[in-house]
Amino acid sequence: MSKTFLRPKVSSTKVTDWVDPSFDDFLECSGVSTITATSLGVNNSSHRRKNGPSTLESSRFPARKRGNLSSLEQIYGLENSKEYLSENEPWVDKYKPETQHELAVHKKKIEEVETWLKAQVLERQPKQGGSILLITGPPGCGKTTTLKILSKEHGIQVQEWINPVLPDFQKDDFKGMFNTESSFHMFPYQSQIAVFKEFLLRATKYNKLQMLGDDLRTDKKIILVEDLPNQFYRDSHTLHEVLRKYVRIGRCPLIFIISDSLSGDNNQRLLFPKEIQEECSISNISFNPVAPTIMMKFLNRIVTIEANKNGGKITVPDKTSLELLCQGCSGDIRSAINSLQFSSSKGENNLRPRKKGMSLKSDAVLSKSKRRKKPDRVFENQEVQAIGGKDVSLFLFRALGKILYCKRASLTELDSPRLPSHLSEYERDTLLVEPEEVVEMSHMPGDLFNLYLHQNYIDFFMEIDDIVRASEFLSFADILSGDWNTRSLLREYSTSIATRGVMHSNKARGYAHCQGGGSSFRPLHKPQWFLINKKYRENCLAAKALFPDFCLPALCLQTQLLPYLALLTIPMRNQAQISFIQDIGRLPLKRHFGRLKMEALTDREHGMIDPDSGDEAQLNGGHSAEESLGEPTQATVPETWSLPLSQNSASELPASQPQPFSAQGDMEENIIIEDYESDGT
């Protein structure tokens, strides 16, 4: 039997693997041939997935004896390779969920996805258009696994889009293109967008091809897109056109899965803005990070099974180490499983073998009796945390809450020395968090974090003197970051002064036993500075457009010239100029000004630029996002204008400014000249 006979049994890695493991180099270092390892991995995974029970139970099955091996297996040494693969198989694949009960996802989220699948797939109307679902959430929270398990249980086919790999451009192909003796041959190329459109058309029109082991007794199917073509991130309008067309001609549901990112790249807002979601009726289901309690149960189950099977070959972590792993993975269960396997697979010299027949509970008692000193124990926990290796991130809502609520730990006289009596008013308990670390984990620039802090700090104070002191710290922090020449150097110092100053100024929260009148929830809001700064930039553009004859900067034009023009009785025929002067040059006669409308800050906000709320100029030096990218801004130009050159410059007016409504009849009116009568006549 030749090796080619085994090749049709090898399926795609995308289908068999739950996730690309981080331990592929284990198999590369082995002496097993490629065809042997591949065929074994596919056969074992397919048998465990389809015909066997759950993963945790199937891992207890013993291997076959040597006498039952075929001649082909003995030739290629499959006995040793099976033992090697069973010992070094990535745990993220070995313990992947197979049923709903094994999912580390909240039951309400599973029911929400299942309800959508039943309504859009199982109860779908014949002439119903294409429905679209957007699933978001942090990496490793079970988005794709939940969808595939529910689809498998309900008998729904999943046709998944995978970005095609372009063929390599060989040197001979390059020579053949420019060979004068032969005909000109272009290198065959097709854009990913064209391939993606063709895939959607074929997937919604034809059924899935029946592969080895597939069950196609049902015609219910969904299209899954998790890895979008890269061109859509540059030109999102092309994706929007594809979505609009699919809603009209689609025959099966289309599901997109996008992972959240706290590093500043908000792909959901770029690819699926609010307008497109409302226009195409896109449903949105957001997953939360895996809860520490659920993750702890999942890791304990893996540790128990591995300890019973390979107790002498792995290092069994204790409860403290597992809790440290759960804290360091930030709700990513894949990262936690990989870290658990990596931390347990240490060298033979560091292994602590157990005696035969010793249970895991007795081994834990033995480890407690032989526990080392505290500094060594702390170093071991730090080693496990370093193995986890994932940066801990905070949403903006939680980061602001840690600063504004400023929880503290009570100290005794033995813990730290007290301040002298003349400095007793500055005495505070130790903070539970480091403000600099909180800002760093929020993945936000320091000056932007100060804006959110300035907007919300007043509601957390009880004394006016404390508010005055906190405002002084914020003012000093703004001075440090005000100069653009030194902003990059002093930004971290400015944020440190602002955060620590606000926390220190709040005397009502200066001690652990008094938390500012209780720890009741207070809503947070986005800074009003965004709306005010947007209005200021629009007024500058309008002033330059309406008064081009005055060669003055926008600031001087609005503070020195326009207020005086509002007091003069110079007639003007341009209604836009009149409205603008009345808006800028005259203040309303109000004793009490109402607060601007505030936009609430949700618990999943990233604090990044939001074009719908006027945040696009927050960090671009007063320019909009389009101007910073070099894109021209569009303006509303009325078609009925026929003004002189001195007044016909409103083509750059923003849409929020009043536009002139003069018609052709108004332009033919005579100019009214008012005579000045002196007191002596």
UniProtKB/Swiss-Prot annotation:
Keyword Nucleus set for record: yes
Compositional bias annotation for Acidic residues: 666-681
Entry GO CC: nucleolus; nucleoplasm; nucleus; Rad17 RFC-like complex; site of double-strand break
Name used for this protein in its record: Cell cycle checkpoint protein RAD17
Subcellular localization(s) per the UniProt record: Nucleus; Chromosome
Listed result of changing residue 143 to G: Impairs phosphorylation. Impairs interaction with DNA and the RAD1-RAD9-HUS1 complex; does not affect interaction with RFC3
Stretches for region Interaction with MCM7: 432-681
Underlying gene: RAD17
Keywords: ATP-binding, Cell cycle, Chromosome, DNA damage, Nucleotide-binding, Nucleus, Phosphoprotein
Motif mapping: RAD1-binding motif: 17-25
Annotated positions of the Phosphoserine modification: 71, 86, 359, 646, 656
Tissue specificity of this protein: Overexpressed in various cancer cell lines and in colon carcinoma (at protein level). Isoform 2 and isoform 3 are the most abundant isoforms in non irradiated cells (at protein level). Ubiquitous at low levels. Highly expressed in testis, where it is expressed within the germinal epithelium of the seminiferous tubuli. Weakly expressed in seminomas (testicular tumors).
Phosphothreonine modified-residue sites: 55, 633
Organism: Homo sapiens (Human)
Amino-acid positions noted as binding ATP in the UniProt annotation, renumbered to this chain: 137-144
